[in-house]
């Protein structure tokens, strides 16, 4: 049965693909990197999945938060499958709970596997595209986890999905223009109700955010952070990288860029 791992800051992008993948299967939805998420919006997502009938576990794999809870859920769901399959046949078998780990790139799938296995069984990195092939990993005597490369929908043009994935580090920044992405990020933060994070993080007057366009706001951010070249001009590419790093690593504050549709 699949364990679906998606970052809270951009959740919906591969839902259709995951739903098809997990069709007629037991599913545990793991919302990893929960420490980076807007707690109010994260709770809405947790309720959304629970209302759909999915088991939902919030984790912060880097700090091993709720990993034991996740393992307990794997065994609980697996036991239900085995009892349903074998109890009526009066067959006694030693259960092996096999889980497919699926999700978009760079959401911590391999890190969670390593925490569950309590060893470095899967290669990890804070950038997408590191896991290249499927790999079965044994945990104890009763759990087998299949680590898989990240999955993305073929089309990412709906609801700024591609921009959101790039902002949260789920696609490689090398394939996008960093200044354009940073400007899109500024617009998203403002439109999604996170204007105050820009004010607090970069000491920008709120009135300026209303008056300036995103490129000019990025220039202000660059000046505030000392991204200057000779002549006192702002190095816009460097300013963009500062903002993108702050968003990706949660330095700007806790955010969710994909909201639950009520």
Feature locations, PLM:
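Short coil/loop residues immediately preceding or within conserved phosphate-binding loops
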Residues: 94-96, 119, 134
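Canonical P-loop GTPase G-domain recognition
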Residues: 37-102
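Glycine-rich phosphate-binding P-loop
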Residues: 98-118, 148
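Alpha-helical scaffold elements adjacent to nucleotide-binding pockets in ATP/GTP-utilizing enzyme cores
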Residues: 6, 48, 69-73, 115, ...
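Active-site phosphate-binding and catalytic loops of NTP-dependent enzymes
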Residues: 12, 80-88, 122-126
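Helix-rich effector regions associated with P-loop NTPase G domains
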Residues: 12-28, 34, 40, 54-55, ...
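Conserved active-site beta-strand-loop modules that form the wall/rim of enzyme catalytic pockets
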Residues: 61, 113, 143-146
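Single conserved hydrophobic/aromatic residue that forms the stacking wall/gate
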Residues: 1-11
């Amino acid at each position: 049965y699949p364990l679906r791992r998606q970052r809270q800051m951009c959740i919906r992008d591969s839902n259709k693909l995951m739903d098809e993948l997990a069709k007629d299967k037991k599913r545990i939805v793991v919302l990893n990197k929960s420490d980076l998420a807007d707690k109010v919006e994260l709770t809405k997502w947790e309720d959304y999945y629970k209302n759909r009938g999915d088991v939902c576990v919030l984790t912060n794999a880097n700090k091993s938060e709720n990993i034991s809870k996740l393992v307990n859920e794997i065994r609980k769901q697996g036991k239900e499958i085995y009892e349903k399959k074998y109890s009526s046949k009066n067959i006694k078998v030693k259960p092996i709970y096999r889980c497919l780990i699926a999700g978009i790139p760079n959401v911590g799938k391999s890190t969670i596997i390593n925490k569950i296995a309590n060893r470095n069984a899967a290669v990890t990195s804070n950038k997408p595209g590191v896991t290249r092939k499927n790999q079965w990993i044994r945990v104890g005597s009763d759990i087998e986890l299949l680590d898989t490369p990240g999955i993305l929908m073929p089309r990412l043009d709906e609801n700024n999905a591609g921009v959101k994935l790039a902002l949260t580090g789920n696609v490689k920044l090398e394939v996008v223009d960093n200044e354009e992405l940073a400007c899109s990020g500024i617009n998203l933060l403002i439109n999604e109700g996170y204007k105050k994070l820009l004010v607090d993080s970069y000491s920008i007057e709120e009135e300026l955010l209303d008056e300036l366009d995103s490129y000019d706001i990025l220039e202000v951010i660059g000046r505030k952070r000392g991204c200057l070249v000779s002549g006192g001009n702002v190095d816009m590419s460097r300013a963009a990288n500062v903002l993108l790093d702050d968003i990706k690593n949660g330095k700007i504050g806790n955010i969710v860029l994909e909201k639950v549709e009520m």
